Amino acid sequence: DGQIGQAAYSASKGGIVGMTLPIARELARYGNRVMTIAPGIFWTPLLAELPQEALDSLGSQVPFPSRLGQPDEFALLVESIIANPMLNGETIRLDGAIRMAPK
């Protein structure tokens, strides 16, 4: 995924995804797990600066549920990752199936 003009940002995200499994394997001997969460568009204080029309537009682009993600939904995934010891070395997209348009 990546939008026009955001090659460096997209590459940095790809780097995180690409190193998740090797780091999980490396740290396994110490009993550590490594997971990556790739969030979609979540409500944050930064978004509070946007006009409501822009927020509605962003939320409507999410296939389902058609809204912005909420912090408690992110936290729920973190709790699930912690609770399940078999989750290791994986990236989970938490994004309501959104893929940003090229521009």
Q: Where are the regions a protein language model picked out?
A:
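Catalytic Tyr-x(3-8)-Lys segment
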Residues: 53-73
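Conserved catalytic loop/helix region of short-chain dehydrogenase/reductase
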Residues: 4-8, 31
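Active-site helix of classical SDR
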Residues: 12, 20
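Short, flexible catalytic-loop segment of classical short-chain dehydrogenase/reductase
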Residues: 38-49
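C-terminal substrate-recognition "lid" of short-chain dehydrogenase/reductases
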Residues: 70-94, 99
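Alpha-helical segment proximal to the catalytic Tyr-Lys
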Residues: 25-29
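Catalytic tyrosine of NAD(P)H-dependent dehydrogenase/reductases that use a Tyr as the general acid/base
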Residues: 9, 17
